[in-house]
Amino acid sequence: MSCPIDKRRTLIAFLRRLRDLGQPPRSVTSKASASRAPKEVPLCPLMTDGETRNVTSLPGPTNWPLLGSLLEIFWKGGLKKQHDTLAEYHKKYGQIFRMKLGSFDSVHLGSPSLLEALYRTESAHPQRLEIKPWKAYRDHRNEAYGLMILEGQEWQRVRSAFQKKLMKPVEIMKLDKKINEVLADFLERMDELCDERGRIPDLYSELNKWSFESICLVLYEKRFGLLQKETEEEALTFITAIKTMMSTFGKMMVTPVELHKRLNTKVWQAHTLAWDTIFKSVKPCIDNRLQRYSQQPGADFLCDIYQQDHLSKKELYAAVTELQLAAVETTANSLMWILYNLSRNPQAQRRLLQEVQSVLPDNQTPRAEDLRNMPYLKACLKESMRLTPSVPFTTRTLDKPTVLGEYALPKGTVLTLNTQVLGSSEDNFEDSHKFRPERWLQKEKKINPFAHLPFGIGKRMCIGRRLAELQLHLALCWIIQKYDIVATDNEPVEMLHLGILVPSRELPIAFRPR
């Protein structure tokens, strides 16, 4: 363990280095001198005359030595409000700008045309941003990498094993009975939890329990009883660990994770303990499921992946862990926000109810095939994900020199794709601040597909997309059939970035039985 004296010496050395670097450079503007792109750099569809500028010419906020733009970010509300700051920067600097946050340097994209250009030049194995805190933990504990941090052919091999089950609609549709089983219990729990005004204390936590039970039944054929009065403490600990991990890794993305590890900071300790808890929960579930495998091809979701695709136990642990934590947090978050949006838009809610009742008379249980006849329900989810996304941005790391807009970007450049900025732009969506699901059903006015990317883009799109959509669509059917979702106040609710976007306060919604 590092002694306090060593920690102080390291900190003093860091501050002296910062002082010695002198004054920060002036903010870069788009008027910087241009340079011609190297011949080997492919021009994207936006280029016409071949004239490009290099990456140092990109506009952006002031870049202080070592700190980058962290001081300005903190002044504007900190990392919790960085999504709002990024939207402000796009208005100020344009569709593409460069920003450095501590040790994290990236180029930000905020237009559909730039994202389309990136997609058209995508390689066979596109790279994501290196999530250094996750890698540091896996190396520290000798665990394998999952799909979020694997790269190259190893990423493709593991992804191929999972996408056979997760990306084929016919395979996902088979899971509706399991999802409905959990939803039936969840609706009963909602009845129990609603107070005399129809409010549910800590609704987000209850939605986490629902999403946890759903993904565990799909993966392990196991229920944890979180929707019952007597719940397993282990499952609650898992959910808490996910939230801790999500809230701590961002801090180590903008400051050197090696420094946190060396100094054994509280952030590193909390992050490591959270991952320990997550793996401790997942491993026994996987082991027990594999031991009970029936040996019948196609009979078991998890075991088929393991047996047919020759993954190692460590690879399975890592991939399933990442899949489960993403499913628990983002699916619950998406359902929470659409319930909020429907509560504030009763006209849209009435139209949704009419559609559901026309397809499912007498409160029938929804099935996957029923969703084909519910375009407005799907439009409601799309609109909610546009207006209040779970994740405000995704990333790429260029694996070759590429030209985007008027800038030649070298290999290794980290790109931040600001998908929330796309969804909130009037250039892409008329009345972008309004919840209007019907915009997705207009035949005469098509929406640019690169203006709405809630699950990412290209080959590294979220592998759990179809499963998440099925869970959310079925959940909406169940809830809208039984409850009128009402707003208990009309005060604005801010979004805070804690790994994903969460409300700044308890959501003011209530559920009144129909």
Swiss-Prot record:
Optimum pH is 7.7. InterPro entries: CYP11_CYP27_families (IPR050479), Cyt_P450 (IPR001128), Cyt_P450_CS (IPR017972), Cyt_P450_E_CYP24A_mit (IPR002949), Cyt_P450_sf (IPR036396). It comes from the Eukaryota. Keywords: Heme, Iron, Lipid metabolism, Metal-binding, Mitochondrion, Monooxygenase, Oxidoreductase, Transit peptide. It is found in: Mitochondrion. Heme binds at residue 462. It is an enzyme of class 1 (oxidoreductase). Its EC number is 1.14.15.16. GO terms for cellular component: mitochondrion. Changing residue 416 to M: Increases the C23:C24 hydroxylation ratio from 0.01 to 0.08. Belongs to the cytochrome P450 family. This is 1,25-dihydroxyvitamin D(3) 24-hydroxylase, mitochondrial. It comes from Rattus norvegicus (Rat). The gene is Cyp24a1.
